[in-house]
């Protein structure tokens, strides 16, 4: 199954809003409707629909941190796979594609992500990509980061 990231547009935003999670997962992230609204008012957000062929399977949204004077840093703010398609490797492929898109910005040095500390599935998933926990933020979320070019850190 070939996974692609596509632009969010007039033709797919309604479907994205209604992508289902399992009930216990709904507390782990903001709704897709809220995320899409955010992306219309913050120019740094990049919302992407996750597809296999023509079937919508999920949603991911990341942004450059230019607005916080961290132009070389990106943050993944939303990431979800329709619960009917979880456990099939789709999320792994989609996150890899998002990381590759971010790497295309030659200035990008790091990617951050946050998740609830009580979500061990997220912790293990992101760690498998090389994300390292950096601590809990003021909202009680665990932050993790991956350095894209370790040579820039020296």
Feature annotation, model-predicted:
Residues 2-3, 7-78, 82-84, 95, ...:
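Acetyl-CoA-dependent GNAT
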Residues 109-123, 127-154:
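C-terminal "cap" of GNAT-fold acetyltransferases
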Residues 69, 82-96, 117-124, 128:
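Conserved glycine-rich acetyl-CoA-binding loop
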Residues 88, 105-109:
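Short coil/turn segments at alpha/beta junctions that flank glycine-rich nucleotide-binding fingerprints
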């Amino acid at each position: 199954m070939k996974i692609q990231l596509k632009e969010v547009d007039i033709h797919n935003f309604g479907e994205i809003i209604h992508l289902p999670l399992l009930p216990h997962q709904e507390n782990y992230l903001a709704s897709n409707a809220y995320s899409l609204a955010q992306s219309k008012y913050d120019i740094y957000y990049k919302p992407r629909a996750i597809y296999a062929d023509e079937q919508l399977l999920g949603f991911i949204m990341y942004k450059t941190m230019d607005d916080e004077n961290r132009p070389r840093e990106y943050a993944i703010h939303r990431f979800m796979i329709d619960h009917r398609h979880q456990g099939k490797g789709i999320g792994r492929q989609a996150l890899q594609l998002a990381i590759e898109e971010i790497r295309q910005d030659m200035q990008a040095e790091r990617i951050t992500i946050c998740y609830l500390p009580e979500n061990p599935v997220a912790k293990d998933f992101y760690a498998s990509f090389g994300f390292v926990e950096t601590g809990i933020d003021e909202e009680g979320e665990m932050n993790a980061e991956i350095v894209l070019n370790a040579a820039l850190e020296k």
